[in-house]
Amino acid sequence: MEKSIFAVVGGDARQIALANMLAAEGITVYCSGFEHAAASLIGVASTDPLTAVLMAETVILPMPPTRDGETLNAPLSTYRIALNDEFCAALRGKIVFVGIASKLREVSPGYAQLNLLDYYANESFLLRNAQATAEGALAEIITHYPRTVCGSRVLVTGCGRITRFLAPMLARLGANVTVAARKPTDRSWAVSVGLEALSFPKSLRKAKEFGIVINTVPAPVIDTKWIDALSPDALVMDLASLPGGVDWDTCARRKIKAIRALGLPGKYSPETAAEIVKETVMLILEEG
């Protein structure tokens, strides 16, 4: 079987764009899990998940591969794609690319024995994906916040890759941006690029001042105390991977608008997101 035969199974609009890009380069591509958007596929063969995997040597699964630990992350599928022993067996002997491979290994011991290559572990991928996520977060703010970004008080919690793209971007649009970070070195970075910086305890004491609160920390940092301290017309956005870091029940009790903003590259920039995955996959294959 030729290495030029790929399977793209599950995922959102970025996986559709990825399949189309591969096919446009003359690569044979089998797809599954895109029934709700089948008309968007160009030059690829649509089939069931097992057939797609069995026909290919290289399989590309989404990021994350699962949200419930039992089925493939396939929001565009008309049916649940079970991550059962049969699907696992079909993947044996294949080169399997996946975003956040640990999520798949946790499903069952069989998945831990597969040849899984994690494109999410590639630093170039992470940086470019963070940039796309930051732009998507800006789109969500513009969509859901009733005021302009310019002049708004914004708090961004955490100081990872997404924050380092998003916080300066918002500041360039005229927002007054504060970064809440645990490490003194992260707070020093924020100050060095012209932002305000606070520890988490100090940011809590100023919570009522912020109109927009954006969490990037996958831990319960925007908790009940935090939500109770916010202005009632604040917007809370959680960019952190599940389970996130926002107390949703308290947001609902206080009727504070809160958004769980996951998969933003796939929602707002699927073609760029697909290019990032494709280039990362091809680089890993070339490097052997």
Report each predicted region and the residues it spans.
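Phosphate-coordination loops involved in phosphoryl transfer and adenosine-cofactor binding
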Residues: 2-5, 93, 150-153, 233
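Glycine-rich adenosine-cofactor-binding loop
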Residues: 6-17, 22, 150-171
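Residues in the short beta-alpha loop(s) of Rossmann-like NAD(P)-binding domains
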Residues: 12, 33-35, 102, 182-184, ...
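NAD(P)-binding Rossmann-fold cofactor-contacting core
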Residues: 25-41, 173-193
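Short acidic-hydrophobic, aromatic-tinged amphipathic segments that line or gate anion-handling sites
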Residues: 43-51, 196-203
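Glycine/serine-rich phosphate-binding loop and adjoining beta1-alpha1 elements at the start
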Residues: 61-151, 280
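Rossmann-like adenosine-cofactor binding region
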Residues: 64, 68, 80-93, 193-266
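Rossmann-fold NAD(P)-binding glycine/threonine-rich loop
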Residues: 95-119, 239-285
